[in-house]
């Protein structure tokens, strides 16, 4: 894994969120990739499950998304990537400010495993 692979997939991932583009998010993942949206939430395995999650949650409940990735890192053994990110959005009509980090495993230029850890501040 190389740093530029992580940065490129993060650009595409952020664009997919901002454009709410299911095809683009699926293009970030291998066909059997795992998307763990949060450590305590259900994991989505493969394009079919990821697409269903996006259609039922992201497209339905989330609007006005602005995504920015920050620093990216690679583990010493080169097998795991990490990426910081920030996001603002409207989720079910409420303004959110989010900050998080992703743990990534890659196969080529696609994500084979992604686990996000994030925190949300909701405007009142």
Please state what every model-predicted region is:
Residues 1-31:
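Short, low-complexity N-terminal intrinsically disordered segments enriched in polar/charged residues
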Residues 2-5, 51-124:
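A beta-strand edge to alpha-helix "cap/lid" segment located at domain peripheries
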Residues 13-16, 36, 89:
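Alpha-helix C-capping/helix-to-loop hinge sites
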Residues 23, 47-48:
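Residues in well-ordered alpha-helical elements
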Residues 32-34, 110:
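Structural motif
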Residues 34-45, 58-62:
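A short gly/proline-enriched turn/hairpin at secondary-structure junctions
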């Amino acid at each position: 894994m190389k740093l530029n692979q992580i940065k490129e997939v993060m650009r595409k991932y952020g664009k997919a969120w901002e454009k709410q583009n299911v095809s683009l998010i699926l293009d970030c993942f291998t066909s059997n990739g795992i998307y763990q949206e949060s450590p305590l939430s259900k994991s989505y395995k493969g394009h079919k499950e990821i697409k269903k999650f996006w259609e039922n949650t992201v497209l339905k409940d989330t609007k006005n998304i602005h995504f920015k990735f920050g620093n990216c890192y690679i583990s010493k053994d080169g097998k795991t990537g990490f990426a910081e990110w920030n996001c603002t959005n409207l989720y079910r009509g409420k303004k959110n400010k989010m900050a998080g980090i992703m743990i990534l495993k890659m196969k080529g230029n696609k994500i084979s495993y992604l686990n996000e850890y994030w925190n949300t501040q909701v405007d009142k």
